[in-house]
Regions:
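Type-3 copper protein
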Residues: 1-158, 249-546, 732, 736-774
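Acidic, low-complexity/disordered tracts enriched in E/D and polar residues
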Residues: 115-223
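Basic, Lys/Arg-rich alpha-helical nucleic-acid-recognition elements, primarily the DNA-binding modules
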Residues: 203-210, 219-224, 246-257, 263, ...
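Short amphipathic beta-strand/extended segments with alternating polar/hydrophobic composition
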Residues: 204-216, 405-414, 617-626
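Glycine- and acidic
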Residues: 206, 214-220, 234-237, 377-382
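C-terminal structured domains
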Residues: 495-729, 735-744, 752, 756-771
Length: 774
């Protein structure tokens, strides 16, 4: 067994020794400042007939006073203002408005909006493990079965290090501005679009017939591998049979081919955090000294403004520095200093900060033992990827047969099959959707979720009693594709404090199970790892076979520099099917160069392989693996369509939190508008469903869930506004999912040097003992 693996006790699975720790940046109990348990008790008594109007109004006014003071105190916290500034500089106006108005300001609609704003950010920073900045730092830990439950220490500061990255879109804007300069234009890199290929005097496309080229154009395209246009022109004119008399002729031909979409002319920045380094390298290759000095100088100006932002030590300095960065950017590029305002995952501002928590941790046998009940879920995850592969084998085979009959050959161009098959993967009705639904139905039958009596809040199972049913329901000998050998569970540890964790007095809660993906393969996660290349080597050890990585277009959903894959091995292949930036020419395979045929000796079984010109081959499903994982990564969802799902526990591992499903109309909270009426309606709704006071609520019209404290005036108001907005968009039937908060605030054990405790979670990488068949 390799040094990077640790056995999961009592199972055939192995866990990577490296563990990612994700955490909040503000103490968990800080959300208590916005709670109003006294007012909640009075409101409940009022609804039950035990309190009168006068008592209710008095308690309400007291809750209002407490809320005003609490919101003011949060707004006065320099770290809070700094966090908000990093995420949304323009939004700081609302925080500053609270400070100007003071803790006892009258509560008009503008003041309430500001309270809502502060509370929304506060819950993100205190009880959600969003990995961003010092308000969501990450760190790396290790695990070994021979060690004590938990050892380590927090450092003297919250953050050990942080890095400020310019957003890729900002670098692209600068690169495009530089490229407009007449002195730079001849030195722009010129490259064949990655999905195209030149073979002799033939230009191959993925989805249309090849185009015959003149000899000079074929010679030109063969040299377009990222060399500057001026270099290509110089070389062709100097070539005896290049076909061009002057460099101007070459440049004119390059412009024409670029307009036709054949060539990409310009600085080519990958969708990765290395985009700044790549741009600098390309600028340094400009051979004209004045043009190079000017171009590099523009990048230096932008980076200097970024560095000033990174060095800002307080909210005022940060605000000024970010304004300076925005001014510099607009002066250099002539463009707005923000993109896609209001969108999630958009990288809206010019830069972002990633932080490493000042923390050293190691976990031992007691934690591993409590992870062992993941075994049934991991086995079912293997089945899911295998079943999806089987379903696509059938779908792909049918498409292949039709195309082979049309072409009169069993070997068909992948470029022609690609787009037909793509519709079954990411189209309106992907084949995988039915498999995922069946996956959850089988689990619901095993757990008897359709037969749970009313009033049951928890279901407990032993892994021993589940073993037979899981084996029967999820039979699979191996995962479906290469990457599917990995599953990435996010687990949260519940303990009363640091000392209890060290003694092994803990409960483990499964937050999410990312099936069929190695979630460490995310660019910004390597920021704090002491030896990131060791992670890459470990992945290559576990997946020695060559793999496909799709070269995605810039507008692909959630395709960002922070989340880009980075752990490719030397033998891995970059598969290009559309124009896209950042192609690695050493690994690139355009779909236009590949063919698909039945596996050798397997013409009737439906197993298709992709073949390269050099003889390499892969199962066809591997070409779509990145897209298939989109269907598996969040497939584990057992709440179904019923109104209530109890908490589900395997041995001592919580695998499903207690969950309630309802609709906007059924809550009755979208209608009331007066604050006190809303609060009473929320207390009535909470009692009718038996909800805990603190929950996470996901409204179908929103991307992310929101923490809601049902004793809090401001969080009840936020909830009602969410529901009212959803009703305005889509009516009464918008789904609302409510989940218990587990771990609770009191279960936060991760401490800083001052004893403040933070929510946290561990992201693990679990390896299947069996590799995917090849």
């Amino acid at each position: 067994m390799s040094d990077h693996l640790v056995p999961l006790p009592g199972t055939p699975w192995h866990v990577w020794r490296d563990v990612l720790v994700r955490s909040a940046g503000f103490p968990a109990d800080s959300v208590d400042s916005l709670a109003a348990p006294g007012f909640a008790a009075t409101a409940d008594a009022y609804l039950a007939g035990g309190q009168g109007e006068a008592e209710l109004e008095s308690a309400y006014q007291e809750a209002v006073r407490d809320l005003r003071e609490a919101v003011y105190a949060i707004a006065a916290d320099p770290r809070f203002r700094q966090a908000v500034t990093w995420q949304n500089p323009g939004a700081l106006l609302a925080v500053e408005g609270v400070l100007r108005d003071g803790p006892h300001a009258s509560r008009n609609s503008r003041r309430r909006q500001r309270e809502d704003f502060v509370a929304k950010y506060w819950q993100r920073y205190c009880v959600k493990n969003d990995s961003i900045g010092f308000f969501g730092p990450t760190s790396w830990a290790t695990v070994d079965s021979a060690w004590p439950a938990m050892t380590g220490r927090p450092g003297p500061t919250l953050v050990r290090s942080q890095t400020v990255h310019l957003e890729r879109w900002a670098l692209v804007a600068l690169a495009e501005r530089i490229a407009e300069d007449p002195g730079v234009r001849p030195w722009l890199p010129v490259v064949l679009q990655p999905h195209l290929a030149v073979r002799g005097r033939e230009l191959r496309f993925p989805n249309r017939p090849a185009q015959q080229l003149t000899a000079p154009v074929a010679t030109l395209l063969a040299r377009c591998d990222g060399r500057p246009a001026a270099v290509v022109a110089r070389e062709l004119v100097a070539t005896a049979h290049g076909g061009f008399r002057t460099e101007a002729d070459v440049h004119a031909q390059i412009r024409e081919l670029a307009e036709l979409g054949v060539l990409r002319v310009g600085f080519d920045l990958p969708v990765r955090l290395s985009a700044e380094e790549v741009l600098r390298e390309q600028l340094e290759r400009i051979e004209d000294p004045p043009a190079r000095k000017w171009a590099v100088g523009l990048l230096d100006q932008l980076c200097a403004a970024r560095d000033t932002t990174a060095a800002a030590g307080d909210p005022a300095q940060l605000t000024a520095a970010m304004a300076g960065l925005a001014s510099t950017f607009m002066e250099l590029t002539g463009r707005a200093a923000q993109q896609r305002p209001g969108e999630t995952y958009a990288g809206r501002t010019l830069c972002h900060v990633d932080a490493v928590r000042d923390l050293d941790l190691a976990f031992g046998g007691a934690v591993l033992a409590r992870l062992a009940p993941l075994d049934p879920l991991l086995r079912s995850g293997r089945w899911l990827t295998s079943a999806i592969t089987a379903a696509y084998r059938d779908a792909f085979s049918e498409l292949h047969r039709e195309l082979a009959d049309e072409l009169g050959s069993p070997e068909v161009p992948l470029g022609q099959l690609w787009y037909l098959a793509l519709g079954t993967v990411v189209g309106a009705h992907p084949v995988a959707v039915d498999v995922v639904a069946e996956f959850n139905r089988r689990w619901e039958r095993i757990l008897g979720l359709d037969k749970v009596p009313a009033g049951v809040h928890e279901l407990r199972f032993t892994t021993a009693e589940l073993a037979g049913q899981v084996a029967a329901a999820f039979p699979a000998d191996a995962p479906g594709w290469t990457y599917a050998r990995f599953h990435s569970p996010d687990v949260q540890l519940c303990a009363t404090d640091w000392a209890a964790m060290a003694r092994g007095e803990l409960t483990v809660v499964l937050g999410e199970l990312h099936i069929g993906v190695p979630a460490f393969d995310t660019d910004f996660f390597r920021t704090g790892h002491p030896r990131p290349e060791a992670l890459r080597a470990a992945l290559h050890h576990d997946l020695p076979e060559s793999r496909f990585h799709l070269l995605l277009p810039e507008d692909f959903p959630r395709n960002t520099a922070r989340t880009a894959a980075w752990m490719h091995a030397p033998a891995d292949v970059q598969l290009a099917y559309v124009p896209a930036p950042g192609a690695d020419r050493d690994r690139l395979l355009p779909v236009s160069t590949l063919t698909v045929a039945p596996a050798a000796g397997d013409a009737d079984a439906g197993d298709l392989v992709v073949r390269a010109e050099d003889g390499r081959s892969w199962p066809l499903v591997e070409a779509y693996a990145d897209l298939l994982s989109v269907h598996t990564v969040d497939a584990w969802k057992l709440t179904g369509g019923r109104g209530h799902t109890p908490r589900v526990v395997f041995d001592d591992l919580v695998v499903v939190r207690e969950t309630w499903r309802t609709t906007v109309g059924q809550t009755g909270l979208a209608g009331p508008t007066r604050e006190r009426d809303r609060y009473l309606a929320a207390r009535r709704w909470r009692a009718s469903l038996g909800l805990p006071e603190r929950v996470f609520v996901r409204v179908a019209t929103e991307i992310k869930p929101c923490f809601i404290d049902l004793t809090s005036l401001v969080y009840v108001r936020i909830l009602c506004n969410l529901l009212r907005g959803a009703h305005a968009k889509a009516g009464d039937d918008v789904e609302v999912v409510v989940t218990e908060m587990l771990p609770a605030v009191g279960d936060a054990w991760l401490a800083d040097a001052d004893g403040n405790r933070y929510t946290s979670e561990l992201r693990l990488l679990v390896r299947d003992p069996q590799p995917a068949p090849r």
